[in-house]
Amino acid sequence: MKKITSFTIDHTKLNPGIYVSRKDTFENVIFTTIDIRIKAPNIEPIIENAAIHTIEHIGATLLRNNEVWTEKIVYFGPMGCRTGFYLIIFGDYESKDLVDLVSWLFSEIVNFSEPIPGASDKECGNYKEHNLDMAKYESSKYLQILNNIKEENLKYP
């Protein structure tokens, strides 16, 4: 079997940051998959389930309600390894093009004070597993990287 793109990245050298994971074209429409890497893989502790679940709910809701980006958002969700998220958007983008959006998103999560969107038994298959405080904590740590973003945080090793 052919190895998928994300398995060709040397995770031992991967820093937290924002990376273009892949670009796909379907019927002349480009989709860009963004790797929002919050943790250094296999070095830092992974994001706990309740925190990553909360970031997913708040993040997906905020992105789909962002006036500028709402029509471009296809998907926002966690990586199985729990070191970050994937964001799939319509359009041809580079990592640097997404710094402002991702910074805005995680800043909004840090300051989020409303009930967690979609956190009821009718809306979510695991509604009891949320942790807003840890979601804010993980988001604030990631913002420190975003606020001092360097080339090494924007290009895969």
Curated annotation (Swiss-Prot):
GO molecular function, one term: iron ion binding
Pfam families with a match to the protein in the record: LuxS
Residues holding Fe cation: H53, H57, C124
Keywords: Autoinducer synthesis, Iron, Lyase, Metal-binding, Quorum sensing
Similarity remark: Belongs to the LuxS family.
Quaternary structure note: Homodimer.
NCBIfam families: PRK02260.1-4
Protein name, as recorded: S-ribosylhomocysteine lyase
Organism: Borreliella burgdorferi (strain ATCC 35210 / DSM 4680 / CIP 102532 / B31)
Taxonomic path: Bacteria, Pseudomonadati, Spirochaetota, Spirochaetia, Spirochaetales
